[in-house]
Amino acid sequence: MRIVVAVKHVPDIQADRTLGQDGRLARDGGDGTLNEVDENAVEAALVVAESAGGAEVIALTMGPDDAVDAARRALQMGADSAVHVLDEAAAGSDALGTAHVLAAAVRKIAEDGPVDLVVTGMAATDGLTSLVPAALAAELGIVALTLAVDVTVADGAVVVRRELDHADETLRAALPALVSVSDRANEARYPNFAAIMAARKKPVAVWSLADLGVPPDEVGSAGARTRILAAEPRPARKDRVLVTDTGDAGAQLAAYLVEHKLA
């Protein structure tokens, strides 16, 4: 069994973020990290692989040079190998372009043996569109089971459990399939020192768009089918108003709401 888990290197959510002139998030000059929910995706892939016995887990990422750090983190957690799609022409890809490149990479990985399961996180913290998993499945022509909190594989099928607002839902699909994992799925393992050192010896393949047979004008800013029309930083949070209750706190609160047109 072969499992591909897609991971993304994103700006640290605790760090200050700036927008470029094109309205996109500036990614240079700041600390980055593995997308948080992708840790849950890697954990889910590893659990499936361990239960299957002898399964191979391949981490897949795309992006600039430092994007490989996300793949290396997956290797430290237990993935067997990694692929980094590195090509300047892919910069600025929208969700559909990203899915197009990742699908081409999955197909190339499958040249060495069928890929049974593709696992992703439910969303990336730098965009939160949640579009890539479904778009990737569509590109590959396979079923997508989204927002999974539990993933198991048996008898040539994947079974996932989803937590909905008022009920749990269990879905089953024949392999190959794609599963996007919820941030409530599991608690990702923390690699120990031995795992971190062992990851240094694991192979990381670097592929260009040419290696994947993807024309540059189909992806990146040039091939994007969506455009950012406007973007601006979120306004700074205003200072809190403290009300001392001397018997008229309710009246003070009501006056504040009326003054700020909140009531």
Regions found by a protein language model. Give the residues of each.
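N-terminal glycine-rich FAD/FM-binding segment characteristic of electron-transfer flavoproteins
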Residues: M1-A263
